[in-house]
Regions:
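Glycan-recognition and catalytic cores of secretory/periplasmic carbohydrate-active enzymes
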Residues: 1-396
């Protein structure tokens, strides 16, 4: 990575305003509320998966297709870690054959999201229980993901057929979260090519998806014939020049995951710059609008982006020395976001929704999942709970 990025000065806040004892009790109450919902959904879903987003508060039931199915077993693994109750492990393990079948038969696998899909379903199972079949499924997923790596452009193509001119050479900020599958595969097999591809992609994302002011494009196109940069645009943000909140959150968290696997401290500083841009554009309740350009408007919030960003901030705190000048600020803001999500966005038992974290946005432009629960929002809220309640080792 060679690009220089501006790091904004942080807006002033008063530190130590969150009552940690009170927050701890709130999080225990939240976990009780969450697990009651999970218990109902385990029965309601059977062998199906929740769709990407609720429709009028109800999860569409789907087969193991699309990019989000692993967020459900990911929630179950987190619930097992936090409660020790066997029913969550058993429910998560029931989905493992479906993920094995999906990758073996190439069912809806023409996507970079194999990292999401197999980190949270199979690597989690292997890390927590030593399940060898889950490990093999994840290794096969890494091999399939390598098929999407273009060595000339040095990127993993996000979506679609590799020969589709509309998709060729397109990388997106979300992919930073998929790279740990490749780093892990190198660690497991001793084959460096997986990690080399992941490192190359992370470098290209840092150089081209991140703008000089530390905002991010959602997507960026590279020339697959020459390797030269072409242009950036959005797919889910407000405009090509705005900053989609969830994308910025993926960046904060995702660059840190590359640091965790490579030790490249440039990734920590890049995450810091993205975090400053994000934190400086939060409304009064610390939960972002769906696009950061919409601060000061009545645009809907995206609680899922807030949960992702809070997890990323806690990962940033872990990566920094104790005496870092802004470390306490990042931790304070992660706690404030967690408090706001718990008080204002987490569904209550009597709320007419099957989801957990309300007021998320999937795709504003298509009207899909607007002001609904989204499966990744539910997952990252649980991950946030796990990070704040105990020593927790990521599945990424």
């Amino acid at each position: 990575m060679t690009k220089s990025v501006i790091t904004e000065a942080l807006r002033p806040i008063e530190l130590h305003q969150v009552d940690r004892l009170a927050l701890s009790q709130k999080l225990e109450d939240a976990l009780d509320r969450v697990t009651r919902k999970l218990d109902k959904n385990i029965v309601a879903f059977g062998d199906k998966f929740p769709g990407e987003a609720c429709e009028n508060g109800i999860w569409p039931r789907t087969e193991n297709v699309e990019w989000t199915t692993s967020f459900w077993p990911g929630q179950l693994w987190l619930a097992w870690e936090m409660t020790g109750k066997a029913r969550y492990r058993e429910a998560a393990e029931r989905y493992l054959p479906s993920f094995a079948r999906r990758i073996e038969q190439r069912i809806d696998t023409a996507t970079h999201d194999l990292g999401f899909l197999y980190s949270l379903s199979c690597i989690s199972a292997w890390r927590l229980t030593g399940n060898e079949a889950a490990r093999q499924s994840a290794l096969l997923a890494a091999e399939r993901l390598m098929e999407r790596f273009n060595p000339t452009a040095k990127i993993i193509q996000a979506w679609g057929d590799l020969n589709d001119p509309e998709q060729q050479g397109r990388m997106i900020i979300d992919c930073n979260m998929n790279l740990p599958l490749l780093y892990w595969a190198s660690e497991q097999t001793g084959d460096p090519r997986y990690a080399q591809a992941a490192t190359a992609h992370a470098g290209q994302a840092a150089n081209y998806i991140v703008r000089e002011d530390a905002s991010t494009y959602h997507t960026y196109y590279m020339d697959v014939q020459t390797g030269e940069p072409r242009f950036g645009n959005t797919h889910q943000g407000y405009s090509d020049t705005s900053c989609w909140s969830r994308g910025q959150a993926w960046g904060i968290y995702g660059f840190l995951l590359s640091y965790q696997h490579t030790g490249d401290k440039q990734m920590v500083e890049l995450s810091r710059s993205l975090a400053h841009y994000f934190l400086n554009r939060l409304p009064e309740d610390d939960v972002c609008h769906w696009d950061l350009a919409l601060l000061g408007t009545d645009a809907v919030r995206d609680s899922s982006a807030a949960a992702i960003a809070a997890c990323g901030l806690l990962e940033l705190v872990k990566a920094l020395p104790t005496l870092d000048a802004n470390r306490a600020y990042y931790e304070e803001m992660a706690l404030r976001i967690a408090l706001s999500l718990t008080d204002n966005y987490l569904a209550h038992d009597d709320d007419p929704t099957e989801g957990l974290l309300q007021h998320s946005v999937y795709h504003m432009g298509s009207g899909k999942g607007v002001d609904q629960c989204c499966s990744w929002g539910d997952y990252f809220y649980l991950e946030l709970l796990a990070r704040l309640r105990q020593i927790w080792y990521p599945y990424w």
